[in-house]
A protein has these predicted regions:
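Exposed, interaction-prone extracellular/peripheral surfaces
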Residues: 1-38, 44, 57-62, 71, ...
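Short alpha-helical segments and helix-capping/turn motifs at coil-helix boundaries
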Residues: 51-54, 77
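A positional/architectural concept
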Residues: 45-51
Length: 321
């Protein structure tokens, strides 16, 4: 199979609509990650992946004995060699499979984009030597795969992400609470959902994770038509989660709809920021490499404070600089 049609003309980013037509979910994830890594060598982010893998930026309070002067000479930035307990991360991906994720106006539903994003993050982290797990939810928890780094883990994870989004309404509380109960070691929790759920209960569940020392990243996946409400003709609109239909003239409600959606998005983002969680709104038309880049930049900013929950610090990975 020749994946070149997924390359945007004149650029190196993958068009999501073309990407979703590529083979399996596992193939799509691998293609995004490998394309991303290759693109780093021809972009302003050249060398970024190496720094992310083996180093972290110096922050006040760090021991200057561990500064790597060779990296400073190449980049003119201060970096420290990562310790062993900083490089081994445990990540759990929480992916929304409720019926609202089945909506899509650009040839692929939100569910396919969300699954590809989750599989991409899993493929990237596994390549770093990190343990990755998965929890899918719709109303309640559907599937749970504990974080592991071993042969076959990525295959099991991507198989659980295949299939349609056909569960009941979005409820963010059960998956967040289950992760808080069963994941004892501090790690990374990534929530991938359209976040079309009440915000009031979200704060309590997220605070359980951040208070326990977990790093939390939230990706709100929305279709461009949901954001802009770009429909033109009056018609019957169906609520995918409740099944209710209502006759709507888009021209009449467009502005109020946009205002309410924006207010909801601000509430979700403010809740995340208040709790120290990273928040990203990702339209399904956005190239997945950019979402991956944002994820890596989050890890660069917060990696200095995230530590696995075990006593002591190891020797620097690869020896003292």
């Amino acid at each position: 199979m020749n994946p070149s049609p997924a390359i945007r003309p004149g650029g190196r980013l993958l068009d999501p609509a073309a990407l979703m037509r590529l083979g399996t979910l596992e193939l799509r994830a691998r293609w995004v990650v490998e394309g991303f890594r290759h693109g780093l060598h021809r972009s302003p982010y050249h060398g970024f992946s190496v720094e992310f893998t083996e180093y972290r930026q110096y922050t006040p309070g760090d021991d200057p004995r561990f500064l790597d002067w060779r990296v400073f000479g190449r980049s003119d930035r201060y970096y420290l060699k990562k310790f062993e307990d900083e490089t081994n991360l445990r990540c759990h991906l929480l992916v929304d499979r409720s019926r609202s994720m089945a909506f899509g106006s650009a040839g692929h539903p939100k569910a396919a984009y969300a699954a590809t994003l989750a599989a991409t993050l899993a493929h990237f982290l596994d390549g770093q030597g990190d343990a990755v797990g998965l929890l899918t939810f719709a109303g309640g928890v559907r599937d749970f795969l504990p974080a592991r780094h071993r042969p076959g883990q990525l295959r099991r994870l991507t198989l659980l992400l295949e299939g349609d989004a056909d569960g009941p309404d979005t409820d963010l509380v059960p998956p967040l609470e289950q992760v808080g109960q069963v994941v004892r070691k501090r790690g990374l929790v990534v929530l991938v959902s359209d976040m079309l759920a009440p915000v009031d209960r979200l704060e309590r569940s997220l605070s359980m994770l951040t208070a326990a020392g977990h790093e939390v990243v939230v990706f709100q996946v929305l279709d461009p038509a949901e954001i802009d409400f770009s429909f033109t003709d009056a018609a019957l609109f169906e609520d995918l989660e409740s099944g209710r239909t209502v006759y709507i003239d888009p021209a009449v409600i467009r502005e109020s709809y946009r205002e309410r959606l924006a207010a909801h998005g601000r509430a979700v983002q403010e809740t995340c920021e208040r709790l120290g969680a990273a928040f990203h709104r990702v339209p399904t038309s956005r190239p997945l490499e950019l979402a991956l880049l944002e994820f890596i930049q989050d890890r660069e900013r917060t990696g200095a404070r995230l530590r696995p929950g075990r006593a002591g610090r190891g020797s620097p990975a690869g020896g003292r600089p």
